[in-house]
Amino acid sequence: MNRDIITGMDGEIYARRDLSREWGGAIDLGTARTGKSFGVDGHLGETNRCGVWDSVDRLKFRTSRNLRLELATDPNVITELVRFDSKGVATVVGSVEYGDRLSLNLTPGRYGLSFFVEGDLISYQVNASFIGNFGSETRPF
């Protein structure tokens, strides 16, 4: 069985036999800030250690200010970004099906990323970076 590896926003390494398919068990990468990034080196489309078909990987993070998320996605997976409301209900705010890029402006809140596959075993890579505030007012000198 292959391992999924996440390089977190502070350089921490998470290696798992498989990432959680449920939001409750998803790795929480913490609070995103300008200049931070993370990467996922994953595998999907095989039976996991619990004997369940592994077709989705999930992870979570949050923002405390307006940030732009730039995702270099893998063309072999469907990528969805969700936002959680105060009750923990997830709503899709952006997605790309078998594309290589997803860029979104994020407001403060809790978010999650899902990576899906419809076929057999694949390896995939996703890299994310957070870029400065958007929508901030500029003060005259």
Tell me the role of every PLM-derived stretch.
Residues 1-2, 42-123:
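Acidic, Ser/Thr/Pro-rich low-complexity intrinsically disordered segments
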Residues 1-68, 74, 129-141:
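Non-catalytic extracellular/lumenal accessory regions of secreted precursors
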